[in-house]
From Swiss-Prot:
Gene Ontology terms: biological process: isoleucyl-tRNA aminoacylation
Physiological role: Catalyzes the attachment of isoleucine to tRNA(Ile). As IleRS can inadvertently accommodate and process structurally similar amino acids such as valine, to avoid such errors it has two additional distinct tRNA(Ile)-dependent editing activities. One activity is designated as 'pretransfer' editing and involves the hydrolysis of activated Val-AMP. The other activity is designated 'posttransfer' editing and involves deacylation of mischarged Val-tRNA(Ile).
Organism whose genome encodes this protein: Coxiella burnetii (strain RSA 331 / Henzerling II)
Motif ('HIGH' region): 58-68
Catalysed reaction equations from the record: tRNA(Ile) + L-isoleucine + ATP = L-isoleucyl-tRNA(Ile) + AMP + diphosphate
PANTHER family referenced in this protein's UniProt entry, alphabetically: ISOLEUCINE--TRNA LIGASE, MITOCHONDRIAL, SOLEUCYL-TRNA SYNTHETASE
Gene: ileS
Protein name: Isoleucine--tRNA ligase
Length: 936
């Protein structure tokens, strides 16, 4: 038998079948660096409309984890897609460099006491730099394009100086407050914590009911209309923090709630209790009392001013009115310790009550505190409860599990503790109202983000921006020693400090002799040594980065971070921006869910479910990780596991194989001279171009709307359905067996060329390494990288009418039914390959009209040796119905010989003497002018 291999146009390409991403991707990275790709993109897009995605700075501590890898990948997808849309979309990465975790690491390594303050700060700076280098390598290895040589760092001298300038503007605009307010305090940190640094965890706490005895019981009884009685009156409070009782200054009741005077017997003694009417039954049940009488009924405002005896201190405390009192639990009477609770503080402020804070920075009672001096606060619960029981003031005690604030770093319970701090006042100059109004102008993705941040801003307290740490940006203020007022020239003085910091770092402030700035006034002023909350550092990036860097702009088009940043960066950025320039720093905000395992659990070493991005990159490649990121619905929790990553790897393989097929059939195609005009295209090729163009519109829209899973699904379906199992499958025969330069083959190659040009760009934002690798093998003259181009727009006008579209959709369904039937016959051993079969289609009028248009070329669409169509009502006994209404099939084994070249079984095989083992079509294609195709 003659070997006809040389007469075939078999696929050939140097584009490797095996991706080998872990080895190949670093080579692509090196090429990008040699090319200086990021700078080239910037130059290429100069003068185009700007699109700014502003990078929220990750913390400079530790290698990139899967959450940060997911974050940077999504951002990179957005930036690259906007670049392909023609925007100038620079990406300036940043890092958050101050704060406690870095201090703790340096402390552990070097010890704090062994170093001077300046040396300690330098050690923190060095440590942060080392962590930035690690993370920068991790992010670049993921294929993230950005200005990695010039990132913004919150510890850069210039950034630190600009942060001081941002604070100066906030001071000048009247938003800064000073006060001794209760703040979340971590004893392990020895510092206040921001709202965003607080985690809520379950904690076991004692829940106690404590009786405060009325000083003038008779007057109280008379208020309730009870006369001629001598029984004492108790006002029970319910609390889960008995340790705060030494700081009690009042008992709060709600002015509008109804309160009852309840007569009962407790501890074998008659007693009157004042309880919220709605809580009488639950309280008496708790006290184990069945027999009680309700005497009188008063609204809370009638109790205001009543005096009570503190249960164990020589202190008289008043009943005051508070709107925060509820009937959800307890007694309706709220223990009020202004030093240990915000609501307590605010209500006490109205009554000018003292802020009595007996707890030091280590979370211990100061030595002269009665009973519990020197003890840690939580250990003080027990002796206080024992004392209350011994004195008869303990009405009930139990242990409950409840959600309680913990330190995000130490995982230890926090306390509320009043300390002198600096605040951005939420209600000063209408900041809260303006923030809520501005939130409504921003586009929130998903939409529920608006309600979430709105509620957080509506409910949040003043923002405590001061910390008592060494490693941070100073709050460079001078306070008058007698009046406590800020120096009248504070903004101007802060500018002078900023200029010093710009040259010498934050040490310039800590080392500064006040006389240098204040002269003779220095003796009257105290220098503030607090540093700024790190959320302030990162919250002013809009001022220090977006406003200062020439290539950026404010407001940014989008901020993109995890949903926890509604409490953190989104909020701190919004508040500082409003306090500085009275508008939001962003036009839109996109949030995503936490990365969890396949069972929805957080990544944890103890659970053994931690997956490191470095390991994924090492084993599967960055493009597989990127494809996983794009495929996930980020609006909910994002699942990851080895199995999920394997699925991403399989999907990647399908995309790569599709690209390889396209490239391997374009090896001899020169788009300048081989492209076929649209009016000469084979109908199937025209359909493929039209389908590609139509899908591109959907994909670009999905990129614009940040619908990455929809893009992933569209590309995956394109590779597996429209292309893989339909178009590419059908045209193999034409590509391989038609005349090399004949119209049928060039028509198919023209379609493949357009598909490849579009396809490589679709995947570029997601699997960037692979897209740029494909780009190097594409035919024709082109830019050195796919990222120096835009979405493909050079499609011919291959538009189909609605009727033509519908016809091809029906053909897809018909072919699917034929394929299923052939597969069944193959599994049953009735046929070998599909080319051994002859198919008769029995079709109703609707389907017949579609099938008949293909004429003799129907067999090429079905990839069978013969195919014919007959009316549905002429079904033979051998025919069987399909799932498609109006279509039945009959499958027979062809009785003809197989063509040695195209493998189809045709009656013409053996009829041509010179080429007895070929069909007439192959003789024409190999040795004559070649066949013609009209439809397929």
């Amino acid at each position: 038998m003659t070997d006809y291999k040389d007469t075939l146009n078999l696929p050939q390409t140097d584009f490797p079948m095996r991706a080998n991403l872990p080895e190949r991707e670093p080579q692509t990275l090196a090429r990008w660096q040699t090319l200086d790709l990021y700078r080239k993109i910037r130059k290429d897009r100069e003068g185009q409309p700007k699109f700014i995605l502003h990078d929220g700075p990750p913390y400079a501590n530790g290698r990139a984890h899967l959450g940060t890898a997911f974050n940077k990948t999504l951002k990179d997808i957005v930036v690259k897609s906007k670049t392909l849309s023609g925007f100038d979309a620079p990406f300036v990465p940043g890092w958050d460099c101050h704060g406690l975790p870095i201090e703790l690491n340096v402390e552990k390594k070097l010890g704090k006491d062994k170093l001077s303050a300046n040396a300690f700060r330098q050690a923190c700076r060095d440590y942060a730099f080392s962590q930035i280098e690690l993370q920068r390598d991790d992010f670049q290895r993921l294929g993230v394009l950005g200005d990695w040589q010039h990132p913004y760092l919150t510890m850069d001298f210039g950034y630190e100086a600009d942060t001081v300038r941002a604070l100066a503007k906030i001071v000048a605009n009247g938003h800064l407050l000073r006060g001794q307010k209760p703040v979340h305090w971590c004893a392990a940190c020895g510092s206040a914590l921001a709202e965003a640094e607080v985690e809520y965890r379950d904690k076991a706490s004692p829940a106690v009911d404590v009786g405060f005895e009325a000083v003038d019981a008779e007057a109280v009884r008379q208020r309730f209309g009870v006369k001629n009685a001598t029984t004492r009156v108790l006002v029970p409070i319910w609390t889960t923090t008995p340790w705060t009782l030494p700081a009690n200054e009042a008992v709060s009741v709600h002015p509008e709630l109804h309160y009852a005077l309840v007569k009962s017997e407790l501890q074998n003694q008659p007693v009157y209790l004042i309880l919220a009417k709605d809580l009488v039954d639950s309280a008496m049940l708790r006290y184990g009392v069945d027999d009680y009488e309700v005497h009188g009924n008063l609204k809370g405002d009638a109790l205001e001013g009543m005096q009570l005896q503190h249960p164990f201190l020589d202190r008289i405390v008043p009943i005051i009115l508070g709107e925060h009192v509820t009937t959800e639990a307890g007694t309706g009477n709220v223990h009020t310790a202004p030093a240990h609770g915000l609501e307590d503080y605010f209500v006490a402020e109205k009554y000018n009550l003292p802020i009595n804070n007996p707890v030091d920075a280590r979370g211990r009672f100061i030595p002269d505190t009665f009973l519990v001096g020197g003890q840690p606060v939580f250990k003080a619960n027990e002796p206080i409860i024992v004392l209350l029981a011994d004195s008869g003031h303990l009405l009930h005690s139990e242990t409950i599990q409840h959600s309680y604030p913990h330190c995000w770093r130490h995982k230890t319970p926090l306390i509320f503790r009043a300390t002198p701090q600096w605040f951005i006042g939420m209600n000063k100059n209408g900041l809260r109202e303006r923030a809520l109004a501005e939130i409504e102008k921003v586009t929130w993705l998903p939409a529920w983000g608006e309600a979430r941040i709105g509620k957080l801003v509506a409910d949040r307290p003043d923002w405590c921006i001061s910390r008592q740490r060494l490693w941070g940006i100073p709050i460079p203020l001078f306070i008058h020693k007698k009046s406590g007022e800020l120096h009248p020239k504070s903004p101007a003085l802060m500018e002078k400090v900023a200029q010093l910091i710009e040259k010498e770092s934050v040490d310039a402030w800590f080392d500064l002799d006040p006389k240098v700035l204040l002269g003779d006034d220095a003796d009257h002023y105290e220098k503030v040594t607090d540093v700024l909350d790190v959320w302030f550092d990162s919250g002013v990036t809009h001022f220090c980065v977006l406003e200062k860097r020439r290539e950026l702009k404010v407001p940014a088009d989008i901020y993109l971070e995890g949903s926890d940043q509604h409490r953190g960066w989104f909020q701190s950025s919004l508040l500082t921006s409003l306090a500085i320039r009275d508008k939001a720093p962003y036009k839109s905000v996109l949030t995503y869910g936490f990365v969890v395992d396949s069972q929805g659990r957080k990544m944890s070493k103890s659970l053994g479910n931690v997956i490191l991005p470095a390991d994924v990159v090492k084993n599967l490649g960055a493009d597989v990780l990127r494809l996983w990121a794009a495929s996930m619905d980020y609006t909910v929790e994002v699942n990851v596991s080895d199995e999920i990553l394997k699925r991403a790897s399989d999907a990647y393989r399908r995309i790569r194989n599709t690209a390889r097929f396209l490239l391997s059939n374009l090896y001899d195609f020169d788009p300048k001279k081989d492209k076929v005009a649209v009016d000469q295209l084979v109908a199937l090729d025209r359909w493929a171009i039209f389908t590609t163009q139509k899908l591109q519109e959907k994909i670009i829209t999905a990129y614009d709307r940040y619908r990455f899973p929809a893009i992933y699904q569209a590309i995956h379906n394109f590779c597996t359905v429209e292309m893989g199992s339909f178009y590419l499958d059908i045209i193999k025969d034409r590509l391989y067996t038609s005349k090399e330069s004949g119209l049928p083959r060039r028509s198919a190659q023209t379609a493949l060329y357009y598909i490849a040009e579009a396809f490589v760009r679709w995947i570029a934002p997601i699997i960037s390494f692979t897209a740029d690798e494909i780009w190097q093998f594409m035919p024709g003259d082109r830019e050195p990288s796919v990222f120096l181009t835009q979405w493909f727009s050079d499609f011919p006008n291959a538009a189909l009418s609605g009727e033509e579209e519908q016809r091809w959709q029906l053909l897809l369904q018909i072919r699917d039914e034929v394929n299923k039937a052939l597969e069944t016959y193959r599994n049953e051993g009735k046929i070998g390959s599909a080319l051994t079969a002859e198919v008769v289609l029995y079709a109703d009028e609707r389907l017949n009209a579609v099938i008949a248009t293909l004429g003799e070329e129907l067999r090429f669409v079905l990839i069978t040796s013969e195919a014919s169509v007959l009316p549905f009502n002429e079904k033979s006994k051998a025919a069987f119905d399909t799932a498609l209404p109006g279509l039945a099939l009959e499958i027979n084994v062809s009785e003809f010989e197989k063509c040695a070249r195209c493998w189809q079984r045709r009656s013409s095989v053996g009829q041509i003497k010179e080429h007895a083992d070929l069909c007439d079509r192959c003789v024409s294609n190999a040795f004559e002018d070649g066949e013609m195709r009209q439809f397929a």
